Amino acid sequence: LSRSIQFQNLAQSYASGVDLSLAYQIPWDRLGKFALAADWSYLARNYQRREVPGGAPEFIERMETDGNTRWRGTTGVTWRKGAWTGGLSGYYIGRFADSATTTAATYTNLGEPRYIAKQFDSGRFLYRYVVGEVITYNAFAGYRFGRDANPLVRNTNVRLGVVNLLDRDPPLTSGALGYSPSVHGTMFPGRTWTLELSRRF
């Protein structure tokens, strides 16, 4: 027994936005050389359109749902003076609506709170919990041993870093894990220290 099935693509996705980047070298260097860098993305529109044969087209809103935030980006400053280096950066993830929904009656009885988003999706309004915006910080400090240093550390770079400096927990979501691993996965381990050693031969 065999069966031949012809698949059809019945949905179209649309997304538009802007990517912004900035790199600036601060001109004065009395305390060392400072550099500023920023990379941000702005999502203007994001939706999906489904056209099922024999049925009316469906408009599915993807803006600020399931991790599709309007704003996302990072800004950081680095410093260098002699053999020393250091840096601090912040990573921002905007708010978005969770996939789980509640009823219009619950939304109304609660006084239409801001932590529930009212979104039009597939011809009806859905009421979703809002996962709040979050900012995490990373930092590092490093030192480069020169050719005149002790032979054990000569031409060696040492770098100590920390991820999620303030030890923030990932925001709560309705998924099985209680958070969104695709969006806030780096926050789950908490504050994480790193040590990097490299040597030039």
Predicted segment positions?
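C-terminal beta-signal and adjacent terminal beta-strands/loops
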Residues: 44, 89-111, 143-201
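Short loop/turn motifs that connect adjacent beta-strands in outer-membrane beta-barrel proteins
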Residues: 11-13, 27-36, 49-50, 146-156
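C-terminal beta-barrel architecture of Gram-negative outer-membrane proteins
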Residues: 36-150
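Residues that define the transmembrane beta-barrel architecture of outer-membrane proteins
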Residues: 14-18, 69-73, 133-137, 154, ...
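Short structured motifs
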Residues: 5-6, 123-125, 181
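Membrane-embedded beta-strand positions in outer-membrane beta-barrel channels/transporters
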Residues: 7, 17-21, 35, 72-76, ...
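Surface-exposed, low-complexity loop segments enriched in small/polar and acidic residues
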Residues: 1-16, 63-64
